[in-house]
Structure formats: structure tokens, C-alpha cells
């Protein structure tokens, strides 16, 4: 899955 927004991309 790709991150559409920073909230999805939690690293």
C-alpha cells in the first residue's frame, strides 16, 4: 500500500 498522506506513512 502506498501512502497518500503523512498519516498513512507512519515510520
From Swiss-Prot:
Name of the protein: Antifungal peptide 1
Organism: Trapa natans
GO terms classed as biological process: defense response to fungus; killing of cells of another organism
Entry keyword set: Antimicrobial, Fungicide
Function in brief: Has antifungal activity against C.tropicalis (MIC=32 ug/ml) including the inhibition of biofilm formation. Has virtually no hemolytic activity against mouse erythrocytes.
Amino acid at each position: 500500500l502506498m501512502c497518500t498522506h503523512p498519516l498513512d506513512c507512519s515510520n
